């Protein structure tokens, strides 16, 4: 087995190079910024490619040595991807709210995990019939709450050996706890992130769904590679195992030419109704397509412009919007 392959083209198609609006940046990320386009910082993918390779190598090495990797991503667009990648690679995850002390107060967290397992026994064992309806409801609610918070680490059995983090701004408590304990951190850093203290920084968009899917898929496959290497070191023949690990199918190709939809506005959404012919209903359709800013419309090529027009029911109108959007973007700068 080997580390998963990826290309700069894949990163481009996933929108990894799109940073935040230029006024929403952390100057410490300047070394990773290629330039500005339509008031959006563009990340230098020539640095992302080797940085991502180093992070994947760290994941593979950690797992090969019997270590645990903890995926951390609690923002909405990362929750499912993080959980799926961790499960697929036999690792661990936190995709709900990060509980303070989840690393630095592991003993208390362990007690909560033990309580979760006890509740499962109480609600599924022979004694379940001894509870009243109200008692079962109370116990079920407690179990669901613990499962949501701790389900991804219930079998971790101790502190992780490496954290993989999506969005260090949102997961700042997790990062600080890892740094305090000397646990290495591999993290996706957008242009508004702080790279200080990150062991394996990977400059890239941390909001776009397709970018997050790509990161999680690559890290999961790197962990699977580490499992394979670990088995080889132990003399285990993977071909004889009953259920070999699967690396999964590649992501679907993008339906867009160069446009990268956003899962939500970056900061405050622009008032797209300023564009000629854009009613509140049309603005909502644009939002549903992942369009929230004039800069996105200004950057559309002819293929994507035609598709946007067809999707909102105004074919041929988008070319005029592009010209207007460029003017509005220039005014914002």
UniProtKB/Swiss-Prot annotation:
**Gene3D superfamilies attached to this UniProt entry:** Glucose-6-phosphate isomerase like protein, domain 1, Helix hairpin bin
Fetch the CDD domains from UniProt: RPS2
Signal peptide residues are none
- Cite the Pfam families for this sequence: Ribosomal_S2
One cellular-component annotation, GO: cytosolic small ribosomal subunit
Keyword Ribonucleoprotein on entry: yes
The GO terms this record gives for MF are: structural constituent of ribosome
Alphabetized UniProt keyword annotations: Ribonucleoprotein, Ribosomal protein
* The keyword Ribosomal protein is assigned to this record: yes
Could you give a single Gene Ontology term from the biological process aspect? Answer: translation
Annotated family: Belongs to the universal ribosomal protein uS2 family.
Protein name listed in UniProt: Small ribosomal subunit protein uS2
Give the source species. Azorhizobium caulinodans (strain ATCC 43989 / DSM 5975 / JCM 20966 / LMG 6465 / NBRC 14845 / NCIMB 13405 / ORS 571)
